[in-house]
Each structure stands twice: as C-alpha cells, then as structure tokens.
C-alpha cells in the first residue's frame, strides 16, 4: 500500500480513529429548518463513512437559540434534535467511522433574520460591508454563552458522538474574542492575551466537565486571519499551545476570516495544501494531534505531510464532496478512479450562501446518496451526441443503469468547451476532472466514437431507443458590423492553438470567458486590453476566483475599457459607444479576439424527435450556462432513463 502513514490509526483523547482521513465540517443545507438532521443528512454522512473516512465531522451546529447563521443549520440548543443526530452517528459508526460534531455560534457572521434575534460579538464591529452590526456581549452574557457550549456538547454525547469540535475560527463568535482586531473589550475578556483567551478556556473547561472526559474535545482555529491587525501564524501557534494547556485533545487548523474567504475555500488557481507551512509552525507548538485542511485533493501530499510529522490528520473538505470514496480508492490503489474537486465553487459555496442544498459539478450524486443508481427496468440502446462534460456524465450514468450507450464526438478530443477552460493560468485541474469523466465512461463500458459527426441519417440507421443531445455551444457572434471579418480570432481557436495572436491584443468581451482569455495572453507577455459592455470586468466570476483573476490583470498590466458597447469591428480594433452616446475607436492592435461568450448549438431542432421520440436535450445544447448546470441536467435525464 502506497499510503502507509495515512492508514495508521491515531488516538485523540479517548477516541481512536482508524486512519488519518477526515471529513471536516462543511455547511450543506441538508438539515431540516427546525434544526434536526434530515434523512438526506444521514445518507450524506453515511456515504463518506462508507468511503473510508476515519473521522466524520458534522457541520457547524448551533449551540445557542438565536444564533443560527442560516435557515438549514443543525441545532443542539435543546433536546428535540438529539434523536436525529443519533441517526447520523449510528449510520457512520456502522461503517467504521468516528463522529465529531462542530459546535458553533455564528456571531457577527450570522444575521438577525435567520437567527430571530440580534447577532452578537466580542465588540460591536460588523464583519463586512452590508452585514448586521452585532451587539456587544455583556460580561454576564459571556458566562451564559459558556454554559450553552457545555449543554450542547452533552447533547451531542447523548447522541453518541465520539468528539466535539469547538469552532474558534473564521470570524465567528469565539474568533472575535481571540483577535485584537475584533476584541476591544475592557473587561476580563479583553486586552491581554490571557484575557482574550479566557472565553475559549472557559468553554473547553465547561465542555469537558459536562462530557466527563468520555469524548474527545477539539477546536478549529485559524492559522492566520489574513487581514491587517488580525491574528498571524505566530499568534495562532501561541493560541494552540495555550489551548493544549486547557486540556484540548486536538487542534484543527483552517485559515482566514470571511472577508478573505479566498483563503477559506480556495479557488482552482490555489495549490493543494496551500496552508501547509503555516500548519507546520502550529504543529511545532503543540504535542496534541493537529488536523490540516486547505484544498487537499489527492493522497500523495497528504501522505507526505503525515509521514514527515508536519501534521497528524488531513481533512479533505470539498474533495470529500467530489469523491466520498477517496480513502477506499487510495487504500486499494485505484488512483485513476478518484474524482477530483476542481475548486470551482459553483455548487458548494454558492449554494451554501444562498441557503440551498449544495451540489457538485464533478459529483452529481451529491445530495442524492440515498437514491444511488437504480437499475433500468428495461435495457435501452442509448445514443449520446457530444463528448463534453454533459455528454460524458449522462453516458456513464446511463451505462451503469444497464443501458447500452454509445457516445459520439465530432472532434478528436473529449471535454467540449471545458477542455479549453483548463488553458488559462491556474486552471489546469479542470483537465483532471475531464479525465475522471472519461475513466468513468470507459470503466462503465460506454462505447465512444471519436471524429463522428451525427446526422439524422445516422440516427435513422442506428435506431436508438433514446437520444441525449449534448452538442454543447459555440462562440457567440452578435449581429455587429465587421464581426465576420476572417482576421477576427475566436477565443476558442486561440486557446486551442488553432490561431495565434500578435503582440498587441484587444479582447472583446470582459466576462469570465474574455477575462480568462486575457489572462492567458497576459501570462505569455502579450500587451492586452479588454473591452466590456458592463461597468466592470469579470462581473460574472465567482468572488473567490475573481480575486485571483484581478490579481492577474494587475500583474500582467492588462488594460480595461468598460461601459463600452462595441458597434463595429476592424481588423485592428473596434468602434464603440459609451453611455453618453458618444462614439470612440480603439485601434492599432495586432489581433482582435472575440470572447463574448457562447450560444447553444443544437443542429437537430425538433426533427430528431420525429425519428426518436424519447430524445432529451441537455447542457449548453439547451442554453449556454455553467458546467454545473450541464452535469446536473445530465444526471437528471440519465438517472430516469
């Protein structure tokens, strides 16, 4: 076995964990609105225990009434939810995993509407622009809050958990007491290091008293707040050492407060294990086990971290969403079967914030664990048209249901437009995702025919029972004078290496597609300008991705023309109109790149249904959207065939 260190058992207080693979606490919005765990919650956690994770951590669970950070947060502030937690614990125990539950008061990161009460913090400082201003907790109230943690821990123990994890990170309630940036108190809970640690110490002591040493007590802290005046790694090392002295059994090291959440749930451009050096410094400060987290996606680096003593356990957060069976595959050395998280943030973080159940671009079964893949009542001959992610996803699911599936791809490469999305700086992990879909198709037994354009005549000849049209999208070409000039380079042709750009380049379109194309060119030392209709570039880019994308713009000195409606294309530039109705020209470029997005491509229309009534159109073939929408529709269609 290649990963000996990762499969060694470890003791954490009174708890023995069978290996070093951890599912960290992650909000999923599967819980019921009354704070109880749903059947969906049970299935979600069971699947990750079944997949070999040694320690499963139930998501941030509310310990005080009036402190909910979202409508579907699990709660342990009264006895009514204990039984539902027991169902999760029993399900995980049956699969050999240990279970911890994270205890949280959202503090200033909550909101009064969800909480049903004013939010609270060490000091009345809002966490971000537009957020509620928290009420400063009185000295007497601090002591009452301490009791709430102890009672919640006792309820968790009654539900059968093996451990609790006290949330002290990310700008939530306890975190606001630790940092001098957010703690301006003048009582015994503010000022000196000892005073700022007092709340945490009292919580640990209360939790240990209420649980009588029968379960392990952990805490999650930041390695660094990543904001001026906040905690840095040296502060956090001292905090970790202090918490060990309070009787803590293990430290879980995360990173950053929410206003720098590009460090909390790092996007695609961030390397796996990007906080490793900070965790290592904290590990040197303590003798208790240390859990590291931060975009770990493969077991190789995790093995190195544990083997070299830089940490003791590794938490695979979003990776456990993408592939709940990752540890089992690592143990069996089925490394190519692993499904990689590409840190797109489309289905997990975006839905978590919106209060919707999370989903996953690379794992369409997330949230549907109880359903699995039901065998088809009758095997069908299924034709899938298009080898992008929608087609690949639909093909392997349909094949695993027992259908006879043939996938047709018109080009010599699979992956569709997602293959090109891997070309801009820092996006290479997308290739890994496409490869994983190909492997799933191959191992399921899907027949793949490359360089095969599908026509209505071919469909008539093959006589399929069902057809899934996943023909994708093509470059959006608006009715603008000169746009059809052969000198204009389509962004997809540029990324695919079919056409080359000159030194000075104008990229027309400043959405995600255009901005990433501009960064691709900037990295190669082109002189790049982006022109965009909206008032800002990258307006459609997820925040955490945009932070890094705009850093590329700064590093590569990419220029911007915004609020500009392109009216005419020239070989060397464009004419555009601004909001005041004035016309301007931007010319003198060696190349003009068209990157205004994509439009759906479905060459069959309704004619195909006259041949095969059981026809479905999915993904960009319906309307150009996110890859998440494509795989979601692929799952919905293929699972019902």
Question: Model segments located where?
Answer:
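Short FAD-binding loop at a beta-strand-to-alpha-helix junction that anchors the flavin cofactor
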Residues: 608-641
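A Rossmann-like FAD-binding core segment of flavoenzymes
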Residues: 431-476, 483-503, 523-607
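Short, contiguous acidic/charged loop-to-helix segments that flank catalytic cores in large enzymes
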Residues: 265-271, 373-379, 420-432, 491-497, ...
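Short amphipathic alpha-helical segments
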Residues: 35, 69, 303-304, 327-328, ...
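Flavin-dependent oxidoreductase catalytic cores
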Residues: 1-385, 389, 393-400, 404-405, ...
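Beta1-alpha1 glycine-rich phosphate/pyrophosphate-binding loop at the start
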Residues: 384-451, 476, 510-548, 559, ...
């Amino acid at each position: 076995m290649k990963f000996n260190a990762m499969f060694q058992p470890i003791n954490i207080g009174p708890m023995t964990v069978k290996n070093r693979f951890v599912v960290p606490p992650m909000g999923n919005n599967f819980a019921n609105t009354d704070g109880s765990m749903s059947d969906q919650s049970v299935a979600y956690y069971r699947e990750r225990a079944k997949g070999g994770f040694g320690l499963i951590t139930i998501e941030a669970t509310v310990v005080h009434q009036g402190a909910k950070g979202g409508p579907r947060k699990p709660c342990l502030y009264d006895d009514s939810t204990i039984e539902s937690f027991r169902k999760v614990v029993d399900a995980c125990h049956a699969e050999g995993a240990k279970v911890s539950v994270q205890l949280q008061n959202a503090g200033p990161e909550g909101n009064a509407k969800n909480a049903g009460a004013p939010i609270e913090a060490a000091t009345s400082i809002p966490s971000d622009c537009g957020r509620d201003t928290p009420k400063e907790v009185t000295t007497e109230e601090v002591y009452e809050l301490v009791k709430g943690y102890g009672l919640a821990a006792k309820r968790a123990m009654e539900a059968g958990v093996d451990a609790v994890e006290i949330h002290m990170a990310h700008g939530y309630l306890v975190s606001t007491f630790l940092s001098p940036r957010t703690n301006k108190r003048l009582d015994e809970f503010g000022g000196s290091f000892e005073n700022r640690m007092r709340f945490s110490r009292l919580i640990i002591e209360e939790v240990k008293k209420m649980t009588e040493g029968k379960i392990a007590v952990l805490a999650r802290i930041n390695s660094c707040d990543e904001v001026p005046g906040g905690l840095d790694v040296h502060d956090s090392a001292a905090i970790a050492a202090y918490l060990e002295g309070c009787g803590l059994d293990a430290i879980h090291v995360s990173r950053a407060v929410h206003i720098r959440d590009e460090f909390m749930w790092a996007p695609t451009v961030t390397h796996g294990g990007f906080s490793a050096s900070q965790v290592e410094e904290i590990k040197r400060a303590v003798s208790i086990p240390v859990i590291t987290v931060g975009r770990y996606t493969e077991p190789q680096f995790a093995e190195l971290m544990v083997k070299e003593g830089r940490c003791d356990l590794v938490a695979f957060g979003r990776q456990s969403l993408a592939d709940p069976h990752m540890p089992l595959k690592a143990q069996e050395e089925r490394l190519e079967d692993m499904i990689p998280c590409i840190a797109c943030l489309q289905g997990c973080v975006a839905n978590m914030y919106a209060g919707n159940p999370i989903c996953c671009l690379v794992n369409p079964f997330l949230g549907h664990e109880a359903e699995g893949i039901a065998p088809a009542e009758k095997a069908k001959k299924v034709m899938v048209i298009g080898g992008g992610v929608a087609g690949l996803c639909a093909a392997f699911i349909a094949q695993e249901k027992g259908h006879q599936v043939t996938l047709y791809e018109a080009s010599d490469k699979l992956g569709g437009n997602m293959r090109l999305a891997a070309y801009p700086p820092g996006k290479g992990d997308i290739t890994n995702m496409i490869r994983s879909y190909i492997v799933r198709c191959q191992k399921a037994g899907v027949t793949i025919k490359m360089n095969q354009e599908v026509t209505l005549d071919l469909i008539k000849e093959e006589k399929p029972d069902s057809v899934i049209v996943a023909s994708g999208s093509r470059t959006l070409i608006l009715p603008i004078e000169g746009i059809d000039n052969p000198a204009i380079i389509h962004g997809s042709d540029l990324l695919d290496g079919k056409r080359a750009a000159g030194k000075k380049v104008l990229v027309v379109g400043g959405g995600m597609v255009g901005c990433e194309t501009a960064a691709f060119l900037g990295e190669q030392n082109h002189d790049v300008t982006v022109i965009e209709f909206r008032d800002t570039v990258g307006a459609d880019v997820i925040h955490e991705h945009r932070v890094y994308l705009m850093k590329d713009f700064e590093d590569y000195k990419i220029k911007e023309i915004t609020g500009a409606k392109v009216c005419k294309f020239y070989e060397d530039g464009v004419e555009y109109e601004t909001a005041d109705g004035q016309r301007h020209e931007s010319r003198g470029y060696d190349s003009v790149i068209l990157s205004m997005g994509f439009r759906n491509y479905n060459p069959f229309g309704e004619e195909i249904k006259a041949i095969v009534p059981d026809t479905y159109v999915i993904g960009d073939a319906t309307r150009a959207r996110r890859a998440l929408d494509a795989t979601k529709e692929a799952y919905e269609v293929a699972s019902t065939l």
